[in-house]
Amino acid sequence: MSKTLTYLFDPLCGWCYGASPAVASIVESTGVGLELLPTGLFAGHGARPMDMSLASHAWTNDQRIEELTGQIFSLTYRDQVLCNLHQPMDSTAATLALTAVAQTQPQREFEALQRIQRARYVDGCNITELHSLCELLRGLGLWDAAERLQAAAPELHAATNQRIDRACTLMNELSARGVPGFVIQDDGEQRLLPSSMLFSQPMHFARQVCGISQAELDNLL
């Protein structure tokens, strides 16, 4: 299958975390290629200091996501991440980490994203700091990526900015709003898929990805 599903995301986006199991299932069952593009929603100038208002808003949304998807947002995460006003809502380091993985073992970038998400939302770890992310990458055996992240060379920052710029350009071209966003690319043509469908009608979303009938999808599954 020559199709590619481009996944527009931010590592600190709760809805992106909620979408992860469905994305993994669709990629595994259909064989569609997966390309990750970070949008920089909470990176760089998009980063925000944490305060109680933001923490409360995030936790309320997180509970909705957990109810809808079954993804865990632990009390440890609430207490150690959201209630830690010294820990900003800043995905800069996590986005750099994923670019380092994309440069060294691109086939494992989605796996690394899932592990970063779990570290934050389940384990309550601080994934806004480079040293924590370096340890996380080493724990996955992504030694080259960890080395690149630790060096934090200008080239890594430039590559990350290029990915963010590409994501933003794609979003503007297709009038995409927010993350997660999904673009199916097939033989030079690209089409924005409704991300809400992934949560409400995942099987129909899979059909949209494949461009096939329900009966054909059933045979794949």
Give names to the regions the model predicted.
Residues 1-6:
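Extreme N-terminal starter segment of soluble prokaryotic enzymes
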Residues 17-121, 220:
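Structural alpha/beta surface segment adjacent to cysteine/selenocysteine redox centers
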